[in-house]
Amino acid sequence: MKVLHVVTLHTPTNAFGGPTRVALNLARGLRGRGVDAELVTLGDGFPEGRLPEEVEGVPARIFRARHVLPRFEVSGITSPSLLAGARRLVRSADVVHVHLMRDLITLPVAVAALQCGRPLVLQTHGMIDPSDKPLAKVLDALATKRLLRRADAVLHLTEWERGDLEAVVGAGELARPVRLPNGTALHQPRVRSGPPTVLYLARFQTRKRPKVFAEAIPEVLKQYPDARFVLAGPDSGELAGTLETVRALGVENAVRHIGPLSHAEALEAFRAADVYVLPSVDEPFAMSLLESMSVGTPVVVRESNGLAPDIERAGAGRVVRRPEDVGKAVLELLGAEANQAASQAAWRLIRDELSLDAVLDILQGVYETATKDRSPASSARSASGRS
């Protein structure tokens, strides 16, 4: 079976975050099971010349991004050559798996898959929700609603996300919804050593609330004066403000900013940390949390995070209601007994419920159903039933 994983963007600094990480994890996992999975995406931030032909061992067709609508950021990038070859591309696949957002790449490729009669699986990563923005309304009218109604399966992370999708497309009109949590590989649990280390590893973006992380630092330093705080991830507009907050609080000597990390470097950063803090709001299902817990590093999240119920139930970290509670949660998890208990719980949560193998089992079942439903025999039966 050949599967195309279509995602909007890949950059050298992993600037697009979760959707690309999920696409790569799934494609790599599928290839390990004998599936011919490839990545199709735009590339940005690469030097002039030939673009990579594989990413982390996954064969990739990367087209150079053109910023045709800069004010819409990632939603405004496209590739004329990819769009021109979209129909030929989707015809080469047994299944087209699109990591869908309102943009000028994933929407057109998904439409091409429908038009060519290819089995189409959509995964929205919390990126499609009700919106009053004019561009969203136009794209929904032209493509989004039709795709959500006619796809062979629509993968959602949580019931909350499914509700958002139904609000966009209309009650009862969502095509074959299937809950597919994100999953990650399980790694050797970390061994705690050295001074206390607290990590922020995410985009520096308003929704991620990196300043909340910075504002918690003085409270932690009062009890752990040797604690170290690491800031990592690509800038999406909030880095300067976060560093200014650090300076204004007078804690710059305890803070290290290390910038964007590769996937391997990110895993090492999680392994070196005692606590990972992601203070973002309305985060559907952050891959960074899974990766932190996969090495046994406890996490601190806000209650609007899609993983908050699982983290709280398992005891894999702390869930806070207010931003001012982040410091207290970190202090609790820096205690030796609490840290060990949360570390073990985090690792078990990945092993038992959120492993990549469990996710791949579900996904392969979705693919098999989609291809059977599009088989000639199935089409003949459907036509007979309608006559």
Go through each PLM region and give its residues:
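Short hydrophobic beta-strand element within catalytic cores of glycosyltransferases
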Residues: 298-302
